[in-house]
């Protein structure tokens, strides 16, 4: 049989859905997957067929969606979001994944996307293709039975609560407006298209033999969606909490801690979530899980580095940056902006493309990556400046998986 890589036709999608069902334990089914297809640009998908002509088997697939990602400086970038990547178990170790990624990266570059992004099913796969983990998922579990808010925590007065308990499907417009405010100011924020709002709210309904009904807590500047765990009836899981002010964040947590029928509240958040410091006993907010979130590949180094903002406090400095398989660039940072141009000058900082992806949003420090020899420079002062320049004054978060 001849293995061929090409764009899928409509006849390929049933085979793609079969491969998805066999590959992804969380496959959402053909109906929902068809809705996600509306986010895929023309020529944004590839398949590998074993055989030629009608009836040939789909043994590999990958696609990208047209997304909008917020980066430091409240800048929103067109972003290619890779997803639906799978290789049949009958065709592993034949280079199919590499071939599909190479072809998609060519198309993404030709379309002018400065960055590509994905959520990795396994942590050891995508670094070789230039992707680096750029956000961190951090689960906190609070024993609410003993939780008390610090006297300094916002909203500690005797006035009425600014939070309402509501049904999610009845307040979509308010959720959308709050989320839109949130995603435009937070590095890692993603525009959520209408089809994904449809899916999110559909998932809030109870499923026979599956998840329980979700409820919502609504504040003028934030919301939280939560449901009781499927098997542990004393655990409430917060599936999404978005707050655009510290007051809203604390008010939502006061309401969650008020779920008296629960023993524990869990949330997948980010490492800089202030929740533990709202409590008199910080140990009650335990870290129960941690993993990489969004991964980034810098497709166009000058365009990406010139697009984001940088810390003003650093002052002006210049260096020469070499990115393996990406080029060598004169980088000048000053007044919160960067100028990046190709150069033949000797490199002062060296790193692989995946390392630049990890640095880009500001969640990971240059000095940490240098300590692991993933970033290399002989100038310690330059490293400190790079550290400070790439830091984000707004904590980096993960919007949603795709």
Swiss-Prot record:
It comes from the Bacteria. Changing residue 292 to A: Nearly abolishes catalytic activity on AG substrates. Changing residue 197 to A: Abolishes catalytic activity on AG substrates. It catalyses: L-lysyl-[protein] + acetyl-CoA = N(6)-acetyl-L-lysyl-[protein] + CoA + H(+). Disruption phenotype: No significant difference in terms of intracellular survival in U-397 macrophages and in an in vivo mouse aerosol model of infection. A strain lacking this gene induces more TNF-alpha but less IL-10 production in primary human monocytes than wild-type. Macrophages infected with a M.tuberculosis eis-deletion mutant display markedly increased accumulation of massive autophagic vacuoles and formation of autophagosomes in vitro and in vivo. The Eis monomer consists of three regions that are assembled into a heart-shaped molecule. This shape is formed by an unusual fusion of two general control non-derepressible 5 (GCN5)-related N-acetyltransferase (GNAT) regions and a C-terminal region. The N-acetyltransferase domain of Eis is responsible for its modulation of ROS generation and pro-inflammatory responses in macrophages. Belongs to the acetyltransferase Eis family. PANTHER family: N-ACETYLTRANSFERASE EIS. This is N-acetyltransferase Eis. It comes from Mycobacterium tuberculosis (strain ATCC 25618 / H37Rv).
């Amino acid at each position: 049989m001849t293995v061929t890589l090409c764009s899928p036709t409509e006849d390929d999608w049933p085979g793609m859905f079969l491969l998805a069902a066999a590959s992804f334990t969380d496959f959402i089914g053909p109906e929902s997957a068809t809705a996600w297809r509306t986010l895929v640009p023309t020529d944004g998908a590839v398949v590998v067929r074993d055989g030629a002509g009608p009836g040939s088997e789909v043994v590999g697939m990958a696609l990208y969606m047209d997304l909008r990602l917020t980066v430091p400086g409240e800048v929103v970038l067109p972003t290619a979001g890779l997803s639906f990547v799978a290789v049949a178990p009958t065709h592993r170790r034949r280079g199919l994944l590499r071939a599909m990624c190479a072809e998609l990266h060519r198309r993404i570059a030709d379309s002018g996307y400065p960055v590509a992004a994905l959520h990795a099913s396994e942590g050891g796969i995508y670094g070789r293709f230039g992707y680096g983990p750029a956000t961190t998922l951090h689960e906190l579990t609070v024993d609410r039975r003993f939780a008390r808010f610090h006297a300094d925590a916002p909203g500690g007065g005797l006035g009425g609560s600014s939070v309402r308990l509501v049904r999610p499907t009845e307040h979509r417009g308010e959720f959308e407006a709050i989320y839109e405010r949130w995603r435009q100011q937070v590095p890692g924020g993603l525009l959520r298209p209408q089809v994904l709002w449809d899916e999110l709210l559909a998932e809030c309904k109870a499923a026979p033999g599956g998840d329980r009904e979700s409820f919502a807590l609504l504040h003028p500047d934030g919301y939280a969606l939560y449901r009781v765990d499927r098997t542990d009836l004393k655990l409430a899981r917060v599936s999404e909490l978005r707050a655009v002010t510290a007051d809203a964040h604390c008010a939502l947590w006061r309401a969650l801690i008020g779920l008296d029928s629960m023993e524990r509240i869990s949330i997948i958040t980010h490492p800089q979530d202030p929740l533990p410091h709202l409590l008199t006993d910080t140990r009650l907010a335990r870290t129960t899980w941690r993993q990489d979130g969004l991964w980034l590949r810098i497709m166009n180094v000058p365009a990406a580095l010139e697009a984001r903002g940088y810390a003003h406090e650093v002052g002006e400095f210049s260096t020469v940056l070499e990115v393996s398989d990406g080029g060598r660039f004169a980088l000048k940072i000053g007044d919160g902006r960067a100028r990046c141009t190709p150069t033949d000058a000797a490199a002062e900082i060296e790193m692989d493309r995946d390392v630049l992806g990890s640095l880009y949003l500001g969640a990971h420090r240059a000095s940490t990556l240098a300590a692991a020899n993933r970033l290399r420079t002989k100038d310690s002062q330059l490293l400190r400046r790079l550290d400070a320049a790439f830091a984000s004054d707004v904590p980096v978060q993960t919007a949603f998986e795709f």
